[in-house]
Curated annotation (Swiss-Prot):
Name of the protein in question: Serine protease 23
PANTHER family, per database record: SERINE PROTEASE (PTHR15462), SERINE PROTEASE 23 (PTHR15462:SF10)
GO BP, sorted A to Z: proteolysis
Domain of life: Eukaryota
Active site per database record: H174, D239, S315
Source organism of the structure: Mus musculus (Mouse)
The enzyme's E.C. designation: 3.4.21.-
Keywords: Disulfide bond, Glycoprotein, Hydrolase, Protease, Secreted, Serine protease, Signal
């Protein structure tokens, strides 16, 4: 026991050196502070009316894996501006292209991806369930209608989206655009919100408190306009495109639900437990909202590689984590990525499959936030 006082003194000295108290609360995973760039429109061009003849893809596949992405050069300033320029589609079928400028751009902002020639040309059965199916169907209106599950919505094209503002939904670009043209149904795109379905026509704000919901149904709101980055339109799933597989939808009216803010994706090692979470409308469980969580297996600057169980229909789901927000002294969930699709990757000569999420980087945060708020001064905190 004689060594215990000496050990205690050593611990105290270590705490003083690290400027913390030996009696402080356990460490909390904290949202990092970032010096964010600014992405601003510079010019807008009118384009010909859009075509809507692409077949909806509920998943995107790519064979360019982590090493392929990590080994490619950074884009030039002009290339980064090109990728972050964007196309806007309006409800009447008209569209515009907006070119952007980037300010306070650091060396690490964005990567252009090349194709891994050794990983192409393979045809394998896609497997999006890893061992035991770890997904959870969410039942009961007390869960479905409350945060965070209530932020998940269904797109009329078959994908999932997440409420990120009073009138805005974040989803995957491939849910509305195949990289060349718009998906069938995008011109009349709608977003579905789960609501209780009452018997005998009861329900809504004027229904009696004794009315019991029979089951859930979708209530739909039309989309006013969509934004898709040119990095997606000019690329494809085997090139840089997957890095830009995200889109923002603006609704015709507010949805009146609590939404989840977007945030810059921290490094995987800073995520609580190294895990991510997301909920979506997987096609193999029709009508059900399906929740899952899993560990991040690898990462690049733009992508998170994981093996969360998922099926087509979950694409576009917002990937989120819950961390401590120091200025407000509270826990907060934020969307840090968008679930995109599936990849077969050659890892040291053997095939490995992943599900992939697009990370919200500082540049992407600046772009998406500007789409939502329309004022870069409101986008200084990621």
């Amino acid at each position: 026991m004689a060594g215990i006082p000496g050990l205690f003194i050593l611990l105290v000295l270590l705490c003083v050196f690290m400027q913390v108290s030996p009696y402080t609360v356990p460490w909390k995973p904290t949202w990092p502070a970032y010096r964010l760039p600014v992405v601003l429109p510079q010019s807008t061009l009118n384009l010909a009316k859009a075509d809507f003849d692409a077949k909806a893809k509920l998943e995107v596949s790519s064979s360019c894996g982590p090493q392929c992405h990590k080994g490619t050069p950074l884009p030039t300033y002009e290339e980064a501006k090109q990728y972050l320029s964007y196309e806007t589609l309006y409800a009447n079928g008209s569209r515009t292209e907006t070119r952007v400028g980037i300010y306070i751009l650091s060396n690490g902002e964005g990567r252009a991806r090349g194709r891994d020639s050794e990983a192409t040309g393979r045809s394998r059965r896609k497997r999006q369930i890893y061992g035991y199916d770890g997904r959870f169907s969410i039942f009961g209106k007390d869960f479905l209608l409350n945060y965070p599950f209530s932020t998940s919505v269904k797109l009329s094209t078959g994908c999932t989206g997440t409420l990120v503002a009073e009138k805005h939904v974040l989803t995957a670009a491939h849910c509305i655009h195949d990289g060349k043209t718009y998906v069938k149904g995008t011109q009349k795109l709608r977003v579905g919100f789960l609501k209780p379905k009452y018997k005998d026509g009861a329900g809504g704000d004027n229904s009696s408190s004794s009315a019991m919901p029979d089951k859930m149904k979708f209530q739909w709101i039309r989309v006013k306009r969509t934004h898709v980055p040119k990095g997606w339109i000019k690329g494809n799933a085997n090139d840089i495109g997957m890095d830009y597989d995200y889109a923002l939808l603006e609704l015709k009216k507010p949805h009146k639900r609590q939404f989840m803010k977007i945030g810059v994706s921290p490094p995987a090692k800073q995520l609580p437990g190294g895990r991510i979470h997301f909920s979506g409308y997987d096609n193999d469980r029709p009508g059900n909202l399906v929740y899952r969580f899993c560990d991040v297996k690898d990462e690049t600057y733009d992508l998170l590689y994981q093996q969360c169980d998922a099926q087509p229909g979950a694409s576009g789901s917002g990937v989120y984590v819950r961390m401590w927000k120091r200025p407000q002294q509270k826990w907060e969930r934020k969307i840090i990525g968008i679930f995109s699709g599936h990849q077969w990757v050659d890892m040291n000569g053997s095939p490995q499959d992943f599900n992939v999420a697009v990370r919200i980087t500082p540049l992407k945060y600046a772009q998406i936030c500007y789409w939502i708020k329309g004022n870069y001064l409101d986008c200084r905190e990621g």
